[in-house]
């Protein structure tokens, strides 16, 4: 096999997107985890302007793909299972880093990814934990907001407040904290979005002070829930708002019949990890971020999110 790498590509053709989507499915079936997170899917679909792409082809067959997100400073890449260990991932990684020195995601912490990281002289800089909560039908969850706050559902005129609270809650989070109103609308345009599942906490004046954006999607005909984003205005942190919103979302998703609820959280965020553990969640897998041992001076290696840290 003598693949040819094409790139950087600013805008993918429809055929390219279809072939890469087929590659994603093949890698997911083989590895048990998708090589792209939600942000990566948005980039593949052309819903963002910050992604650059590289494609490895053997003849007409797509055997590898990489994308770099200039806004999040991250790289995601994949190689078709039959084409692995032939230098394709190394070539794609080096091509992407020449343009965007970045952190590279390894979803599921696959052994092959660890080997490649070592070969390229990369170090582990982040761990993103996937936690899960089984949903027995008799599991009680009550939501009790602090005095002066009330639980409500998102309204269209809440969008600016939602974005502002999200930014404040994730101010040290270049990915989640950078969510714009347009980003939020893109997420709300997805098939799974249900306005009833975007729960908010308001003060007595009606101001939004926190939110729990839940997600329910079918997996092989079985509904599965997710704590998609949980954010609280910093002025209300430590008052039980995050836990109350978490419980309200769990109750909402339980009523929809989900079999389990998942979430993603930074491994370094011990306070929030402990909150989720107290609610019954446990770690089921780990995503790892790798970066050059000597990061580029302009690169921000602060706390970032993947497909997104869901924080409280």
UniProtKB/Swiss-Prot annotation:
CDD domains under this entry? NAT_SF
Q: Which SUPFAM superfamilies match?
A: Acyl-CoA N-acyltransferases (Nat) (SSF55729)
Catalytic activity, reaction form = 1D-myo-inositol 2-(L-cysteinylamino)-2-deoxy-alpha-D-glucopyranoside + acetyl-CoA = mycothiol + CoA + H(+)
Q: Which UniProt keywords are present, listed alphabetically?
A: Acyltransferase, Repeat, Transferase
Binding of 1D-myo-inositol 2-(L-cysteinylamino)-2-deoxy-alpha-D-glucopyranoside occurs at: 38, 175, 215, 226, 264
Q: What is its EC number?
A: 2.3.1.189
Task: State where acetyl-CoA 2 binds.
Answer: 230-232, 237-243, 269-274
Q: Where is this region: Disordered?
A: 292-312
Q: Where does acetyl-CoA 1 bind?
A: 77-79, 85-90
Q: List the GO molecular function terms.
A: mycothiol synthase activity
Give the compositionally biased regions (Basic and acidic residues): 297-312
PROSITE patterns in the record: GNAT (PS51186)
Known partners and oligomeric status:
Monomer.
Task: Please state which protein family the record places this protein in.
Answer: Belongs to the acetyltransferase family. MshD subfamily.
Question: What HAMAP family does the record tag this protein with?
Answer: MshD (MF_01698)
What is the stated purpose of this protein? Catalyzes the transfer of acetyl from acetyl-CoA to desacetylmycothiol (Cys-GlcN-Ins) to form mycothiol.
Output this protein's name.
Mycothiol acetyltransferase
Its gene?
mshD
């Amino acid at each position: 096999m003598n693949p040819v790498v094409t790139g950087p590509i600013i805008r993918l053709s429809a055929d390219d997107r279809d072939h890469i989507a087929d590659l994603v499915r093949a890698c997911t079936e083989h590895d048990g985890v998708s090589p792209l997170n939600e942000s990566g899917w948005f980039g593949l679909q052309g819903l963002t302007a910050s992604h650059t792409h590289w494609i490895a082809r053997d003849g007409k067959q797509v055997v590898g793909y990489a994308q770099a997100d200039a806004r999040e400073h991250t790289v995601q890449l994949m190689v078709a299972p039959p084409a692995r260990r032939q230098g394709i991932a190394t070539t794609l990684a080096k091509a992407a880093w020449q343009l965007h020195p970045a952190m590279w995601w390894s979803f599921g912490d696959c052994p092959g990814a660890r080997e490649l990281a070592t070969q390229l002289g990369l170090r582990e800089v982040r761990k993103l934990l996937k936690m899960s909560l089984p949903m027995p039908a008799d599991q009680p969850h009550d939501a009790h907001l602090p005095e002066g706050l009330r639980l409500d559902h998102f309204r269209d005129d809440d969008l600016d407040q939602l974005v502002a609270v999200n930014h404040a809650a994730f101010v040290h989070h270049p990915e989640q904290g950078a969510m714009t109103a347009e980003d939020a609308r893109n997420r709300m345009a997805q098939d799974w979005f249900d306005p009833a599942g975007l729960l908010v906490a308001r003060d007595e004046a009606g101001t939004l002070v926190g939110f729990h954006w839940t997600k329910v999607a079918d997996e092989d005909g079985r509904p599965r829930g997710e704590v998609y984003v949980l954010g609280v205005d910093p002025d209300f942190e430590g008052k039980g708002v995050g836990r109350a919103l978490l419980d309200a979302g769990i109750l909402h998703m339980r009523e929809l019949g989900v079999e389990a609820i998942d979430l993603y959280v930074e491994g370094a965020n011990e306070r929030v990890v402990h909150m989720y553990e107290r609610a019954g969640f446990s770690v089921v897998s780990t995503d790892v971020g790798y970066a050059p041992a000597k990061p580029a001076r302009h690169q921000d290696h602060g706390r970032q999110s993947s497909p997104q840290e869901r924080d409280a």
